[in-house]
Design a protein with these regions (language model features):
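Charge-rich amphipathic alpha-helical interaction elements
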Residues: 1-121
Length: 121
């Protein structure tokens, strides 16, 4: 029974690690999507104003702010990529731990099945 609890605990860890990876991946996708939307807004604003040089004195303040937000989102997406890789490694470790726990439980259950036969024989 002790092994059964260990298997359930490690299974729970694996599920939680998968959820974390999925959540980080969704966040990264959202950041990338929002950055792409900002790119489109920047292009639209530059097209409206006719000024594409960010150093020009009359460059749109909205476009400057959108560029800054886009750059921040892109940096955050890069940071998330590092976190995703770390979370995937953690998930792989948890899956290996689960596999070992399941094997140990299986061996224990097989041993428990064979022991009563030996005792009666």
């Amino acid at each position: 029974m002790k092994r059964d609890n260990m298997v359930r605990l490690t299974r729970f860890k694996v599920i939680e690690k998968r959820r974390q990876v999925e959540q980080l991946e969704l966040m990264q996708e959202d950041f990338s999507r929002m950055a792409a939307e900002l790119d489109a807004q920047i292009l639209n604003e530059e097209k409206k104003s006719g000024i594409t040089d960010i150093n020009h004195f009359a460059y749109s303040t909205f476009a400057k702010a959108a560029r800054l937000r886009r750059d921040n989102l892109q940096n955050s997406a890069k940071d998330l990529k590092v976190q995703i890789n770390a979370a995937r490694l953690s998930l792989e470790e948890a899956e290996a731990e689960l596999e070992n726990a399941e094997k140990m439980e299986q061996r224990d259950s097989q041993r428990d099945e064979h022991e009563p036969r030996r005792a009666t024989a």
